[in-house]
Every structure is written in C-alpha cells, then in structure tokens.
C-alpha cells in the first residue's frame, strides 16, 4: 500500500522523537552477548558553564554519528557521556566567581562550593547536547564521583607496588596563583613584551666589567653561574674565573657551555635557580648549587627584597641597578613566557616535594607503542611521537589543591623520625586528609603516628584512564576484557595530544604493557565564522541551541559533518546549515514521492537505466561505508548530499517519473514496477546511509512507512549484483538531461514544455530512449546525429 507523508517536515517532531527514543531505551548501553562490542572513549568535557559552545558540540555530534553507524552494522556500542569535574578548572572558576582563595577557607567548605557549582551546570549541559540527538548513555557519575575516584586510586596503588612511583624533592614548574606543581604538558606559552636588560657584572679576578643581558633581573639573587659558548673567542679567557653578581654580590663561576647563544644579548648568560628548564638542565648537568629565592606564593623569600612579589622585585632591582650605574641599557623584546594552562599566571620553577610517575626511562617503548595505534588521520601520530621525544622530566602527579582525587597515602611518623608511606589495599575510595585510615594501614603503623596525605592528583591522572571507565570496569556490563585494546576508539582534539592522549598511553603501558586503545580519531577545532577560536572573553561564543531552534537539529548536524575534513579545523557556517535544511526538505519530498506508490513485493525485470542507477549507488555506498568505518563523517555527508539530491532526485527520479506514474499507459506494467521497485530500493538504502548524520528526519519517515525505527535497521554492504549495471549509461543520461535543460532554458522554455524535435543520442543512451522521450517531451529519441548539437561533447543532438 502507498503511504502519505505530511506535506512538510515539522521541527516539533524532533522533540517528540527524543521523548520516544528515551522511552524506547535507546540511550542506554545494551550488551547482547552475541554481537561484537565497540567502545567510544568519549572525551569527558570540563564543566565550566551550563552549555558547551557549538564548535565543541559539533565534535560530539561526530562521535554520535559513528556510534549510530556502528549500531546499524550490528555492533553493540558503549558510548558513554560523563563530565570531567576534577581539578583546577572548577577551582579557579569558583575562586573568581565568589572572590575566595581556596587555601584561605576551610577545605570542606571550598569542596562543597565546587560541587554545588558543578551541579548547577550539569543538567542543562547534558540536556542541551541531547537536543542535538546525541545518543550517548549519560553516566551521572563523573570523574569526581566515588566510583571514578576509587578506580583512579586503585590504579595508583598498582603503580606504587610496581615501583613506578616515587617521592622526591626537586625543581618543578609551579603556578604561584594556584599554588601547585604542574607537569610539562600543562605549561602554555604566551607572547609578552618586556625589556632585555644589559647589566654590569664584575670579574672577581681582574676587576673588569662584563655585560650580561637578561629579561629576569629579579633572579639575579638566585644566579649560580655565568656561561659562554665554548667557541665564543670574546670570553674563552674568562674560563675558570668568577663573576660578582649585583646587587647582592654573590660570587659565581664563569663556565663554557653550548647552551649559550653568542648572538643573543652580549653572549654571556646568567644561570639562575630557576629561570627556565634550560637553567634546570644546566644546574643538574654541572652540579651547581641551588639558591631558591621565590616561595610558593610567588614572593621573594630571602635577602634585601624578601616579602615583595616577583613583579615588585623586578622593578626594585632595576631601580637599584640604575642608581648604582650597573644598568647599561634596555631593549624592548617580545618573548614567550610559560604560563599556567588554567589561570594563565606566569610560572616559576621552585623546589617542592612531589610524587612522580616514571616516564623518561620508557620513552623508546612509548614511541614504539605509538606506532601500534591506528591514527585517523595518520599524520597526527608524529605529533605524539615528537612530544614523547621532547620530554625531559618524570611526571609530577601530586597537586596541592582540593577538588580532585585524593592521593591514597598515609604517612607513618616513627619515633626515630622516619616518615614511612603506607597505602591501603585498594578497592575503596579513600580521603586520607579527612578519614580514619583503614585497618591494614593502622596495623602497619602500631609504633608511629599516622597522618593522611593532603595532596591530590593531577586531573590528567584521572582522565588518562577514561578508556577503562568507558569500557565499563565499574559497571554491571563490564566489557573491558572483551574490548581491550582492540575495540576501543579514542576521539579527541589535536590540542590535547600531549596531555590526554600521551598520558593515556603512558598509563596503559605502565598498567598493562600495551596501548590503551587501537584507534585514535583526531578532530580539529570548532571555530567561529571568521576562523577564530571561540572564547567568552572575545564574545564570539555561538550558543549550540540557537541554530537548532531556528533550523532544527538535523540541518545543524549536517553542518557539523560537512564543515571540515577529519583532522582539520571547521568553521561555523550558517549557510551550510541552510543547505542542510534544504537537503532535509529534499529528502522529505523524495520520500513523499516514493511512498505515494505501493511498494512492489517482488523484484521485476529491471531496465538498463535502473541497473545503472544501482551500479552508481553501489559505488556511493562503498565509499560511504568505508568512510564511516574509518570514523570519517565528512565524506559520507558530501557523498550522500550529492547522490541523493543531484543524482537520484535530479536525474533518476525525473527520468522515471513518467514510467512510475504511467498515466498514459505507454509503459508496460513490468516496466512501471521496475521503476517503482528501483525507486524504493535506492530510497531505502540511501535513507539508512543518511540516518547516522540526520537521525530525526530519517526515523520519522521510516516510522511512517514501516512502523518501526530506522535505527534498528541494518546497513548491509550493497549487493554485489548491483555492480552489474552500467554506470556509464547513468552518467551519460545525466549529460543528456543537462544538455536538454540548458537548451530549454536558453529559449525561455519551461522544462515541462514539449519540444517539437527528435533527440539524437548514442547507442548506449538508446537503452534509456523511452524514459528520455517522455521525460523531455520530445517527438522521439533516435541514435546518431541530428542537425543541431546542443552539448559540448557532441553527445546530444536535435533534429
């Protein structure tokens, strides 16, 4: 029987479908036991506002399209969504919003403030993503839940017992504002304009002046050496002598070292503890003494300038140098300053006691494992490898903050002064700074006094085991043993390759000796219309729901898929969304047309042009399925848009419309059924291929036609018999159609007007002669050439 779709698509049906999908349980993980299982290690976003911006949402739409495709290929997909609620981002936000300083108020109160702030955002954040039709399984237990933190602590305890964790007092990058150590990937660089100060030092042995240029005069009291390049003939005579450092007068050695650049400043370089990682490297290499002058709050703690901030110390020292005649000159300079990734405060390097995870000794093995993962696109593998090669320090994982997973260590202070770390057996969530130690810890410290560690983990220590959490290790459907690592895919942006991806690789290797997942899908950044990153401070953040309310979710999802190739940045473009809306309308109208005919129950004898269309669809389907399988949604979006609109609708439907209706009875019933059967076959298959990208309109149409959801259908490989058709015939028909349409347009004719002429075509095209005749309303269609050529290739003539 025929079906009648409503005249127009109505956006309100999207909300109705969302409720229906929820009722049908489509957002819950289902593991059948008989189908293969695949895990999408969904990036848990930082929760810093009540909604994500549209660029971020577009990437999550990509993940949803992949999940929907895999389900329609017979795969049980674990596609979780939960929030990253740990660490500095929320702490800094709460401090700024409420005007508090974390370490100046009770810890319990600050933690409560952070949790309440997060809770106030989460509901709307999740529901706004759901409005896009994202079919994730929402897990309310985010990274701050006892469930997740228990898993984090358990893996730490495992690493501890493997001898992969140690505590040490050593120089570490430090944020004075956040008052915590940072790891190398958490360091960002910002261009700043400053002064290069040329300062007089004295050579102790000769009394002569030497000039040293520095952008950090506040570190003069921390200077422990002066270096020059071994090949710099200006200074080789100073080797082994000593410099007197102003303004406090400490005496330091003058030494040769290749790190000095003869072409920068005067060629002499002061080494301070610590100006940057270069200083740190040279101090360690040359075994120089350490003079720490900056405290954890970013203030000078010794000497004449004690108690003032770094900025104030810089100004005071410059003033003192000027007054003493020791400041030769100043040059304006733009240089890169290391800053905290979260609050953007310039970093210092100070000596603190931290917990470290071993990583430097495993660099070669990690590079080898990077080659084992499949990167989409492949060029991003090298970005990871280059980062691994650049690492110089072990990973400091302890942080002196509050809203994060607590480090599960109690310290046993022995009567002899020894301080022994004691760890629980694991399996519970431990809060050592607040809770009583477990029995096994008490038992191990009978003769001492127990103190719970007050530190927390780096937030990347939590998120770097997301692949375990996503596999359901804490859930009833634990699929980890089935999927690890061969059936796990990590989708993420290129901006966190050196953090989330690297640390995930490190953790998997240290825990299991393998990679964390087989596939790595790298997406670009979502940008505004001008190609700029979206930031609240710029005022260019585009709300994810505004275009959905205007156009509907499917057109916006179409933009998300079509906006940029895999691995490249993608711009917000309302014109593409409008194209998506027009495409949706075209799909709706095609469906109304096809469904106006009763669906044939048996396959009839197809005409050559019917088989030609299916041959074309075979190639399109292969391309689309291959791209989806490679986690690419850009190619399917463009291929389906082109085929459905510009080949199936524009050419095939127009070609066989007369045959399908057969109002004049010029076609046989078999010919008519062949047209209708081919229309249904191509329409059904195309609709299923489109469903992952545009799930609302395709599901509504399918339910109207068949009374069930399209998302329960299978996307099978196209039948091999479809290849038997001659695609050349279909492409030739397209050329003939275009030539006749142009001919009519040039003469001001409607495409439906009769053309009192004979259409001359090739022998191949004669296989579609009858359809061409009634489509273009010509007198006849014959082989050969007529009097007037109407195309550029000499394929189409009139006579």
From Swiss-Prot:
One of its GO terms (biological process) is valyl-tRNA aminoacylation. Coiled coil: none annotated. The keyword Protein transport does not apply. SUPFAM superfamilies: Anticodon-binding domain of a subclass of class I aminoacyl-tRNA synthetases, Nucleotidylyl transferase, ValRS/IleRS/LeuRS editing domain. Keywords: Aminoacyl-tRNA synthetase, ATP-binding, Cytoplasm, Ligase, Nucleotide-binding, Protein biosynthesis. It catalyses: tRNA(Val) + L-valine + ATP = L-valyl-tRNA(Val) + AMP + diphosphate. ATP binds at residue 536. It holds the Pfam family Anticodon_1. Its main location: cytoplasm. It is an enzyme of class 6 (ligase). One of its GO terms (molecular function) is aminoacyl-tRNA deacylase activity. The keyword Ubl conjugation does not apply. It is found in: Cytoplasm. Its EC number is 6.1.1.9. GO terms for cellular component: cytosol. Disulfide bonds: none annotated. Belongs to the class-I aminoacyl-tRNA synthetase family. ValS type 2 subfamily. ValRS has two distinct active sites: one for aminoacylation and one for editing. The misactivated threonine is translocated from the active site to the editing site. Catalyzes the attachment of valine to tRNA(Val). As ValRS can inadvertently accommodate and process structurally similar amino acids such as threonine, to avoid such errors, it has a 'posttransfer' editing activity that hydrolyzes mischarged Thr-tRNA(Val) in a tRNA-dependent manner. This is Valine--tRNA ligase. It comes from Pyrobaculum aerophilum (strain ATCC 51768 / DSM 7523 / JCM 9630 / CIP 104966 / NBRC 100827 / IM2).
